[in-house]
């Protein structure tokens, strides 16, 4: 397998820990107390800091042990952090070139609290820019990496495997990259290439990724075709998952809770739920429901038993406006 050993590619300084951000509230925005679910003691939505020129968001990762969530900003690459019980999130990592990051997409957290960030097109046409980053829970830059073997990787989403490594999907080619510590640094390697099975077609190809219940496979969404694919964790072998004829076009984030899989269909403004086998091979009992018509949800994660979904603002043109939200229990 092709491998690249990590060192930081950008020397820009990083401020560890949470950086306090000023949050401008929009007209008619509810107060923090009004946004709180009094029965659970948690907000029903969380406000993200935004740029004066407008912001868009995409990924979310959660740290169950510390009760934290992290949200990636597409416009600039900032990373925001919040807690389960605080209605206002704060900027955690700066963007606009910090550590070579100008945009950010998928994000996840491992058991140690390390935060993995997919760069989307960050490195395309810019060989000195990383494709992905790894930070410790206190904000220390651990790795800023290019992936091997391709100059136009669009790293979309990321999930932690049963082996503790992080697996990143490529929305341009049907590839998955594995990132893990190696020696005295970090390594990114091409883990699976399904070019002989999955066709690269116009639009976003591989995106959302979730580990099966038994850890034997990743379930991966191909948004432009609405297909679901199974990648065996033992060797990366790929096979199609029969979705029972379900319309899953614009499939983006995947959330697995036990044997239920949720597929968030961003611009379709729909959410599909289905039963999925423990090995990720078979789905059945597919149901669809509309999501909020005024929001474009991209993905979600479960924090302390509750689903948190990112409102991307992707549908607001030419520039989005606040307030910017992560929504709790968005389609309960």
Spans of features found by a protein language model:
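Secretory targeting and sorting signals
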Residues: 1-32
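A short helix->beta-strand "capping" segment at the edge of beta-propeller domains
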Residues: 36-55, 284-286
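Asp-box/WD-like beta-propeller blade repeats and closely related beta-sheet repeat scaffolds
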Residues: 42, 126-163
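Beta-rich, blade/repeat-based domains predominating
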Residues: 51-66, 98-119, 123, 148-166, ...
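Short glycine/acidic-enriched loop and turn motifs that connect beta-strands
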Residues: 76-78, 121-125, 173-175, 225-226, ...
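A short loop-to-beta-strand structural motif that recurs across blades of beta-propeller domains
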Residues: 78-80, 130-133, 175-178, 227-229, ...
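Short loop/turn segments that connect beta-strands within beta-propeller blades
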Residues: 83-87, 136-140, 180-184, 232-236, ...
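Blade-level signature of beta-propeller repeat domains, shared across WD40, Kelch, NHL, RCC1
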Residues: 299-332
């Amino acid at each position: 397998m092709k491998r690249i050993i990590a060192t930081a590619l950008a020397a820009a300084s990083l401020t560890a820990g949470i950086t306090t951000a000023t949050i401008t509230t929009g007209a008619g925005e509810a107060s923090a107390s009004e946004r709180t679910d009094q029965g659970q003691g948690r907000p029903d939505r969380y406000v993200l800091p935004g740029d004066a020129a407008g912001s868009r968001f995409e990924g979310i990762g959660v740290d169950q042990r510390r009760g934290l969530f992290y949200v990636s900003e597409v416009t600039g690459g900032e990373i925001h952090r919040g807690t389960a019980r605080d209605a206002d999130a704060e900027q955690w990592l700066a963007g606009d070139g910090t550590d070579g990051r100008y945009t950010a997409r998928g994000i996840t957290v491992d058991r140690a609290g390390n935060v993995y960030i997919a760069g989307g097109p960050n490195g395309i046409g810019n060989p000195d820019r990383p494709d992905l980053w790894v930070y410790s829970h206190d904000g220390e830059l651990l790795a800023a990496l290019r992936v091997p073997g391709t100059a136009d990787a669009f790293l979309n989403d990321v999930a932690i495997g049963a082996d503790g490594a992080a697996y990143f999907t490529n929305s341009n080619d049907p590839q998955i990259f594995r990132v893990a510590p190696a020696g005295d640094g970090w390594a990114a390697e091409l883990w699976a290439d399904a070019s002989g099975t999955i066709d690269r077609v116009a639009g976003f190809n591989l995106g959302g990724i979730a580990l099966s219940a038994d850890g034997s496979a990743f379930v991966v969404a191909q948004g432009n075709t609405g297909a679901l694919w199974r990648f065996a964790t033992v060797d990366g072998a790929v096979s199609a998952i029969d979705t029972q004829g379900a319309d899953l076009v614009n499939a983006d984030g995947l959330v697995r809770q036990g044997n239920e899989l949720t597929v968030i269909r961003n611009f379709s403004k729909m959410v599909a739920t289905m039963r999925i086998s423990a090995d990720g091979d078979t789905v059945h009992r597919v149901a669809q429901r509309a999501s909020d018509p005024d929001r474009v949800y991209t993905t979600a994660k479960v924090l302390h038993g509750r689903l948190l979904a990112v409102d991307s603002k992707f549908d607001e043109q030419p520039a989005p406006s606040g307030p910017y939200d992560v929504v709790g229990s968005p389609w309960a």
